[in-house]
Regions:
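Intrinsically disordered, low-complexity Ser/Thr/Pro-rich tracts
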Residues: 1-86, 107-110, 114, 186-196, ...
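Beta/coil-rich, acidic/histidine-enriched accessory regions frequently appended to metallopeptidases
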Residues: 21, 25, 29-31, 36-49, ...
Length: 628
């Protein structure tokens, strides 16, 4: 860590006012002149055409309730769901576990033996696996005595887990593709999720983790926090949840991994998103960890505890906590990307407990003039350093909007969007009268990008006023159910562009029905979502392209949209000197110009809600005109 002094210079942009005319003083007229009555009938003004406006994107999307969904879709009967009787365990007993094979996207069953029993934990070992039993016992006892209390103090002072058992279970076995995991599915009855173990389980892969090591305890602490967070705020954004889990390792006094270094080697990594390919997530872990560590060090334990317990998600939870400081999530993010470069010990721009390397430069500017056309992810940063012999004139311009997913609706300007998030249940519903037809066909256009085999969209019909629903089969929907998340014929994965879907409604001809589109996501990772346009039922003359509004469809989580959100920018410079000077702009008009000296670092960051689409910008480095 470097010990420097920082001077923050606020910058006010003076933007030109266009098309503004200052009126001359009004002439005073003492009496109004007589206006004769016209001898003709004036032509009435035409009725104005109302142009619809997109709905605002909600802060929170509806949270899924798998029990309610199972009843509504006829998977289980209404009424109380039996829960297993809490069991008393003893060393040497055996039990069968459902375990996920992540690379193969499937569950398998295996038998394990109870090896270690403490006040709060039952540690099981998969049958036939060699393991150092003494090292396992020492690790579990150390976790119980030292690590468990530290994590509970920060993340859940009152144990929130409604245990169907007498302990928290730790499965130690061979688990392909991961070091460990926690699954919220185990909190449900097997009637609701077919692969539930019906008890709280932390899964550790002893193929890559050795009991008795810091690494084993770190992964155990990491997954234990995920368990706690599921019960405290189960629909929290994945990037926040993962940051909390890494902070659990750090707060417990365990060494943190090299993910921070991986992130700083790729600082153009979106903080607020998570890839659905686990092999690409290592820099994301680093971003989440450094951001949470920065927040914890700057605002303290109490603020961090309030953040953990906030019912809001993602940036909104930070805004809630930071409001008392007069700050926003964007303010904190802007300070953080400066801290990642300066790492100053004595100011808000650095870390006290960590010593991360500098972020990788996007480019070093060694000659001028030069113009760069670049992209940067939302809530990420590109770093440039001026290494010329003379001052330069910087000119920046960037796009003012960004898309949520597809480049445009299938037709016109408007469409519906499912929203996105973890543990989401969004619906879009409309009544239809099919009484006067003996045949009916639903047609619609869709563009979707959903976490394959984990997140699904369904098309449903109800003929009893919405009490019960049936999932309909489409051309591209699938009944494959490798992970247990597919409730019927679901759309999942990627459509590869706008596609036409067709569903037979003839079994409901002659009836009044409700049609519904429903997005249901699991508890981690989400993609752009499901977009919907141009719905038709030709047999009853129904066609809706949504260019005049909602068209009678009632959303609960779905958003009426043009697919575009405002693109924000934060441009910052660090000017070398003693002390260094930090300048910051949030431009709303382009181009932005600034004269910069050799040695100056420029940081370009983009911010837009919800989307994971990158932002485009231009940076021109030019000679300073003479006289400036």
């Amino acid at each position: 860590m470097k010990k420097v002094f920082i001077l923050l210079v606020p910058v006010v942009l003076l933007l030109p006012i266009l098309g503004c005319v200052v009126p001359s003083p009004a002439t005073v007229v003492p009496f109004a002149p007589h206006v004769p009555t016209p001898c003709f009938t004036p032509t009435p003004s035409p009725t104005p055409i109302l142009i619809p406006a997109p709905d605002p994107i909600p802060q929170e999307f509806p949270v899924r309730d798998l029990a309610e969904i199972a009843v509504r879709l006829g998977k289980i009967p209404p009424g109380p769901i039996p829960t297993p009787t809490p069991a008393l365990h003893h060393p040497g007993e055996e039990a069968i576990f459902w375990v996920v094979d992540h690379p193969a996207t499937r569950y398998f069953t295996t038998t394990a033996e109870l090896s270690v029993l403490t006040a709060n934990f039952c540690a099981w070992v998969e049958r036939g696996r060699e393991i150092d039993r003494k090292a396992l016992k020492d690790s579990i006892r150390r976790f119980e005595a030292e690590i468990y209390p530290r994590i509970m103090e920060i993340f859940s002072p009152q144990f929130p887990i409604p245990l169907n058992d007498s302990c928290i279970h730790i499965f130690n076995g061979l688990i392909p593709g991961v070091g460990g995991y926690f699954s919220g599915s185990d909190a449900y009855s097997r009637q609701i999720h077919q692969y539930s173990n019906e008890k709280p389980v932390l899964y550790l892969n002893i193929g890559s983790l050795k009991p008795g090591t810091e690494h084993y305890l770190s992964v155990l602490a990491h997954e234990f926090q995920h368990m706690l967070q599921w019960y405290v705020d189960r629909n929290e954004d994945t990037w926040v949840n993962e940051g909390f889990s890494q902070m659990a390792e750090f707060i417990a006094g365990l060494s943190y991994n090299g993910s921070a270094r991986a992130f700083l080697a790729q600082p153009d990594t979106q903080l607020t998103s998570w890839p659905d390919d686990p092999g690409k997530a290592y820099p994301n872990y680093g971003a989440s960890f450094l951001f949470m560590a920065y927040f914890y060090e700057r605002f303290g334990k109490e603020a961090f505890q309030n953040l953990v317990r906030s019912p809001l998600n993602g940036p909104h939870s930070f805004n809630e906590i930071l409001a008392s400081q007069g700050l926003s999530f964007e303010d904190l993010f802007a300070d953080w990307v400066i801290a990642n470069y300066l790492d100053d010990l004595d100011s808000k721009y650095g870390y006290r407990e960590l010593d991360p390397p500098k972020p990788q430069l996007t480019a070093a500017i060694t000659f001028i003039p030069i113009t760069l056309t670049e992209t940067v992810h939302q809530y990420a940063a590109d770093y440039f350093k001026i290494q010329t012999e003379e001052p330069v004139l910087l000119r920046f311009s960037g796009n003012l909007t960004v898309t949520l997913g597809p480049q445009s609706p299938y037709s016109g300007k408007f469409m519906w969007w499912s929203g996105r998030g973890d543990e989401v249940d969004s619906t879009l519903t409309r009544p239809f009268n099919l009484k006067n037809t003996n045949k009916a066909t639903l047609r619609f256009r869709t563009w979707y990008d959903l976490e394959k085999d984990y997140d699904y969209v369904y098309v449903e019909v109800s003929s009893d006023g919405g009490n019960t629903w049936k999932i309909l089969r489409g051309i591209r929907s699938s009944e494959d159910n490798p992970i247990g998340n597919n409730l019927g014929y679901g759309y999942t994965g990627k459509s590869g562009g706008w596609v036409e879907e067709e569903i037979d409604l003839t079994p409901w001809a002659g009836k009044e029905i409700l049609l519904r589109f429903e997005l249901i996501t699991d508890d981690a990772v989400n993609n752009p979502g499901f977009f919907l346009d141009d719905i038709a039922i030709p047999e009853i003359g129904y066609y809706e392209d949504f260019e005049r509004g909602h068209g009678g469809w009632v959303p609960n989580g779905f958003v009426y949209t043009d697919g575009i959100v405002k693109q924000g920018w934060i441009i910052q410079v660090i000017e070398s000197g003693k002390p260094p000077v930090v300048r910051r702009w949030k431009p709303v008009d382009f181009p932005l110009e600034a004269k910069l000296n050799p040695g100056t670092v420029i940081i370009v960051s983009a911010f837009a809600p919800v989307t994971s689409e990158p932002a485009f910008y231009n940076l021109a480095f030019m000679h300073v005109p003479s006289g400036q």
